């Protein structure tokens, strides 16, 4: 009987050790608070049952929070009330801003941990969100929802830290990552503020009118955050098919066999890749943003810099060197120039722009049917190099020096990136081609 009691006590002790290990994620957590002699006694088969009983009680007392956790009613009740308050206030508005606010709040307050690892950062974030919801009385107004979204955007780094470090269950991690992605996409360019301000009038109130030689100002977002951009690299599972692109469109990931080699992959400069895009002329950016060097060298249209502020053509001083020549000779020169111009126009007639619909529903405009066909083929899974070559469009080979780099804020689908640093994983191909990050900028910093 004494032998059976000792075996039963030893089995209970082993079960307790396994329980503490599984709940904490630390295989040595059960040793906390034990002396070296007690640790040795646990792994010794000849230890008496009385001593094992004392060690067992000591382990359970040390980890009493795992056996007798504090009642979660208060915390869960606060979170439920905060979600209910936010839902009641934001439900008064049928706007994308209000829906995104509610998505982020629900994902944060409903997140659960598998183990205690990383729990402090999650609990702190949840308390801050609960407090923010309680003290706000204007969530039922469009201005209040936008202001609350700016508060949530300020928590992007905290949300990223929770996703990267906390031991979340699968459902919580997926929901929180989807909310983070939507919120991060909304933060780029501060589109909410741009919509509030509306189009700026030329030459009015505080902003001088631009001269003809100046480029139009483009909306820019804050300085790029390498840690934010690199979060997607930390867990390839976050790029699964169930992750929805903000706006309700699901982005399709090309299969590994059809994924083009990364140095020839068209699209925006992706974080962590160090790419310098080379210009493929003739593609207009979604939303009407002009590309650097658009249509440069195509057709006979003069450069914008060839006109002064009144729209008059500016001639080179050398054009006036022969102004004193006889009228007959100048007339002959003009006739020859007209014949050359007519010949050039007859040999290369201008081609009408063509609209291309991408698999995710977005549309881009190409300057020629050939470029449109290349973009459509590449978006359907054809390797980038093959898609462009089939249309007779040459693109730079890997390692080619970029003669006309495009400003990162002005790149679009159809530009070709020539990589000069660490290649990107193939899982990012869908984000690269669909221009999810078409305003990202190359940067250096910590990666996950």
UniProtKB/Swiss-Prot annotation:
Record's compositionally biased regions (Low complexity): 243-261
Ranges of compositional bias, category Basic and acidic residues: 187-198, 307-334
InterPro entries: DUF4226
Region of interest (Disordered), residue spans: 187-221, 243-270, 291-361
Similarity comment text for this entry: To M.tuberculosis Rv0025 and Rv0739.
Protein name, per record: Uncharacterized protein Rv0026
Organism, scientific name: Mycobacterium tuberculosis (strain ATCC 25618 / H37Rv)
């Amino acid at each position: 009987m004494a032998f059976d009691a000792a075996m039963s006590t030893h089995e209970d002790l082993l079960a307790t050790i396994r329980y503490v290990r599984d709940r904490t994620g630390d295989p040595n957590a059960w040793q906390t608070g034990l002396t070296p002699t007690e640790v040795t006694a646990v792994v010794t088969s000849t230890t008496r049952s009385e001593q094992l009983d004392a060690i067992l009680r000591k382990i359970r007392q040390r980890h009493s929070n795992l056996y007798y956790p504090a009642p979660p009613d208060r915390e869960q009740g606060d979170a439920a009330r905060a979600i209910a308050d936010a839902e009641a206030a934001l439900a008064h508005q049928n706007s994308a801003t209000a829906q995104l606010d509610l998505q982020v709040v629900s994902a944060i307050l409903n997140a659960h941990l598998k183990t205690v690892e990383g729990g402090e950062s999650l609990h702190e974030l949840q308390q801050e969100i609960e407090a923010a919801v309680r003290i706000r009385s204007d969530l039922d107004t469009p201005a209040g929802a936008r202001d609350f979204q700016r508060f949530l955007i300020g928590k992007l780094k905290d949300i990223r830290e929770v996703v990267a470090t906390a031991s979340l269950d699968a459902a919580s991690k997926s929901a929180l990552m989807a909310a983070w992605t939507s919120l991060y996409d909304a933060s780029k360019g501060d589109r909410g503020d741009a919509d509030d301000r509306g189009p700026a009038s030329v030459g009015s109130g505080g902003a001088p009118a631009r001269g003809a030689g100046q480029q139009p100002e483009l909306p820019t977002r804050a300085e790029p955050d390498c840690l934010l951009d690199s979060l997607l690299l930390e867990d390839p599972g976050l790029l699964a098919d169930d992750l929805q692109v903000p706006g309700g469109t699901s982005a399709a990931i090309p299969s590994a066999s059809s994924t083009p080699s990364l140095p020839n992959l068209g699209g925006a400069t992706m974080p962590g890749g160090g790419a310098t895009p080379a210009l493929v002329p003739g593609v207009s950016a979604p939303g009407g943003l002009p590309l650097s060097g658009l249509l440069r060298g195509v057709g006979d249209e003069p450069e914008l810099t060839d006109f002064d502020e009144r729209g008059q053509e500016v001639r080179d001083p050398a054009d006036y060197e022969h102004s004193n020549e006889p009228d007959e000779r100048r007339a002959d020169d003009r006739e020859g120039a007209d014949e050359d111009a007519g010949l050039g126009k007859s040999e290369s007639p201008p081609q009408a722009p063509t609209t291309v619909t991408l698999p995710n529903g977005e549309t881009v405009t190409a300057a020629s049917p050939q470029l449109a066909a290349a973009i459509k083929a590449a978006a359907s899974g054809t390797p980038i190099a093959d898609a462009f070559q089939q249309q007779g469009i040459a693109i730079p080979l890997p390692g080619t020096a970029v003669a006309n780099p495009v400003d990162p804020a002005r790149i679009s689908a159809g530009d070709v990136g020539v990589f000069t640093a660490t290649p990107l994983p193939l899982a990012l191909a869908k984000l690269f081609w669909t221009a999810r990050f078409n305003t990202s900028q190359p940067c250096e910093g910590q990666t996950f």
